[in-house]
Structure formats: structure tokens, C-alpha cells
């Protein structure tokens, strides 16, 4: 918080309303560019219909970029997910979360199997991620921002995914030690 002038540790709709009002004071060409970072703000108290949802559908008009992180993919509302233009997918340890992500974004490359190829190719090292550039049509799939893996259903990379560890699952008969 000390490194940034306008950093908050909570969210209210009023904050977004004030940001929009401050941008509306400018002509479009004079608006300052703004980045809003929302780090895991999605909780049971975060309504799916709020000013963030509105802003995510209109952010281009206000010269704002929005970076939203979450650990629960579907807790992000449909309007926000549908308006996402750049998606970063880190390694998922929860197979159900990965299934939701795969279901949502596999249509950008034509099949769930190809999506999983892109996903596995992107996670070649710790802390790596699959980057989807959804502003392009067809979408472009990258390892980090460095290696183009494919354009839509056209795989560019000649690599084959290595055997990757399966997402972590707790055995049904698991009992934690006390």
C-alpha cells in the first residue's frame, strides 16, 4: 500500500463510481489511462451485478484497463468473462476449476482436446501460464507472452505436450492425521 497513492484493501461500488466520474471530466482524447487491479475480490459478499460488471462492459470508453485475479473461475460474472480480452491461465490444481475454464475457452480453438494441448504446452515450467489474446480473431494462444502456440484451431507449435502431472485430487477415503 505504501508504494501506491490510490490503493485500497476493500471494494465498494462508490469507488468505481468516483473513478468513472473523474474520467468523465475529460474529453476522450485527453483522458488519462488508468489501470484497476482487483486481486481476488470475489467473495460471497461480492454481487454478480455491481459497478465492476458495468465497468467491464464499458471500460474502453473510460480509458481503463482492468486486471482481475480469482481462484474461483465461475464466481466471476458472465458479463465480465465475456468481455475479457486478455486471459492468463496459471496451472490449476483443482480439476473441476480446469474443467470450467476448458469449457469456457475451448470454443476459441475449436476443441477441448486442442485447448488442453495449448494448456499443457504453456505450463512447461513452474509459474508459467497460458495467455489467450482474445482481441485477435481468431484468438491467439501463447506460452507466457513469448511463444505463439496456436491461432484458433491452427496449432503453430511443433512441440508435443509432455506428460504433465494431473490436477491434485483428494482420495475419497483420505483422512487427515490429527
Predicted regions and their residues:
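Conserved P-loop NTPase motor cores
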Residues: 2-111
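Conserved P-loop NTPase motor module
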Residues: 124-178
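Short C-terminal domain-edge/linker segments immediately following a structured domain
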Residues: 66-71, 97-102, 118-124, 160-166
Amino acid at each position: 500500500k505504501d508504494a501506491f497513492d490510490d490503493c485500497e484493501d476493500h471494494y465498494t461500488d462508490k469507488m468505481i463510481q468516483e473513478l468513472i466520474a473523474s474520467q468523465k471530466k475529460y474529453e476522450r482524447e485527453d483522458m488519462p489511462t488508468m489501470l484497476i487491479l482487483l486481486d481476488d475480490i470475489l467473495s460471497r459478499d461480492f454481487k454478480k451485478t455491481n459497478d465492476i460488471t458495468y465497468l467491464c462492459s464499458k471500460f474502453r470508453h473510460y480509458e481503463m484497463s482492468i486486471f482481475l485475479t480469482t481462484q474461483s473461475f465461475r464466481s466471476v460474472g458472465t458479463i465480465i468473462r465475456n468481455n475479457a480480452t486478455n486471459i492468463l491461465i496459471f496451472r490449476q490444481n483443482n480439476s473441476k476449476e480446469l474443467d470450467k475454464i476448458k469449457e469456457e475457452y475451448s470454443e476459441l480453438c475449436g476443441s477441448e482436446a486442442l485447448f488442453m494441448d495449448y494448456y499443457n504446452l504453456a505450463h512447461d515450467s513452474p509459474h508459467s501460464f497460458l495467455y489467450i489474446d482474445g482481441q485477435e480473431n481468431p484468438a491467439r494462444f501463447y506460452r507466457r507472452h513469448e511463444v505463439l502456440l496456436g491461432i484458433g484451431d491452427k496449432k503453430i507449435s511443433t512441440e508435443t505436450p509432455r506428460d504433465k502431472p494431473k490436477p491434485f485430487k483428494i482420495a475419497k477415503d483420505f483422512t487427515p492425521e490429527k
